[in-house]
Amino acid sequence: ERDKGNFTWDDVDQYVVYAQEHNQTILATIWPHADWEQKSCKRKKARSAFGKRFTKYLSKPCSMDDYKNFLLKLVDRYDGDGSNDMPGLTKPIKYWDVMNEPEFKMFFKGSKEDFIEIFNFSSKVIKEKQPDAVIVMAGAAGMFPESKKYWKVVLPKIKDNFDIANIHHISGPDGQCDKQLWVDEFAALLKSADVDKPIWLTEAMT
């Protein structure tokens, strides 16, 4: 949404078409940041890890109503319900990953409470629009001490609003990989938060 109410789907459509042609299933990551919207309440610019093609802002939406409108338009285009779908859609998007590694400031400039609000809000909006949607937890960036500390606080407050837990295998400063891809420690953290859900590893550094 480059401007309020002006939705441009070309880039996303290309990914969806490619996935359909190659029989791939999409896990779509939702970023709740639009430049025009963040400017409206004078959010501070941020340096993105993804360069110039990505948003210059990484804060909580200024207006959750505007964000909800974006979410509804997004899901409506790719849910495969036959209404307002992308032309030629044959393989709907069912799996939605709400945000990415929010404990890293290069991906999210907000508090734990901000993330919790955005995540729970997004999940409920998506499920209302697409009842069979599967919500994937924003990927945890490994199980380093700071990540564990972050998710220990956050997990109990979002656990009712996701279907699949999500861990990313991030190597340490020494470049060494965790032999269990962090899944063992992540499973223990989930158990401590009374979360009993499937675990997906959606990023891996080797």
Predicted regions and their residues:
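Catalytic-core region of carbohydrate-active enzymes that cleave or remodel glycosidic bonds
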Residues: 164, 170-206
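Substrate-binding cleft and catalytic face of glycoside hydrolase catalytic domains
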Residues: 1-162, 166-172, 195
